Every structure is written in structure tokens, then in C-alpha cells.
Amino acid sequence: MAAKHENPYAALKTLFHEPNRLAMMSALSQAIDGLTFNDLKRECGLTDGNLSRHLKTLEEAEAIRIEKTFVDAKPRTTVFLSDAGRKSFIEYLQALEEVLQKAARSVAAVEKKSASRRLPWGKLVKAGEG
């Protein structure tokens, strides 16, 4: 696992943080043989235009590789995660996990502190009264 960042938020790459691209990268990370354009579109629930736009962004960042072939005289576009894309996506997921764990700990601590200040019937005790 990569070293913990002093500021894990800095490692949250906007390239992957956009929900549709996060879904696309997640789907591609499970597909060793890549996914066809139509399979990726269906998997992520995107339109042709929306998928094309996000594919262009990911391809420009060298996170994916697009292969165009013909099968039975029909064009087929297959999308693969690049080695650099896989590495970068793993680093992003590790940073995201670190941020989420920190947030979960903070929420739990606040909930615990709030719970200790509640009266049995659920009312909060005002500061200085409890």
C-alpha cells in the first residue's frame, strides 16, 4: 500500500472523482480483456455521447486505451485500462479510502459525544447544563 499522505485530499484526482468516470474506471478495473463501448455504456448507464466525452477525457490522461477493430464487418470499440491508469486509479482509491475512514471516525466521535449529552428521552442537554 502506498504511503499515507499528509493531506489525503490532495490525492483525490478530479479525473476519477467525477461519478461517471469513477463508475467507468471501476468497471474497467474488473475487465482484464477490456469492455466494448456498448458493454461499458450499459454497465455505467450512460448515453453514447456522455460515454464518448468521458472516454476522451480518460484517453487524453492516458488512463485508458481504446482499440477499434472490425468483427463480422462491423466496427467494434473496446476500452482497456492502461497500466498507468490502473496504477493511478489504485492510488486514487487508497486516498479516497483514507479520507472516508477519517470522516467515519470523526462522525462516530461526534455521535458518541452527542449521545453522551442526550437525556434518556432523546433531548439534547444544552452546553453547561449537563
Task: Name each region found by the language model.
Residues 62:
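Glycine-centered, phosphate/nucleic-acid-interacting loop/turn motifs that mediate DNA/RNA or nucleotide
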Residues 7-50, 69-72, 76-80:
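N-terminal helix-turn-helix DNA-binding core of bacterial DNA-binding proteins
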Residues 2-7, 26, 87-130:
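Amphipathic alpha-helical dimerization/coiled-coil segments
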Residues 66:
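Short beta-strand "wing" residues that participate in macromolecule-binding interfaces
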Residues 71-92, 96:
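Basic, amphipathic "hinge/linker" alpha-helix immediately C-terminal to the N-terminal HTH DNA-binding motif
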Residues 55-56:
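Short, hydrophobic-biased segments on the C-terminal half of alpha helices
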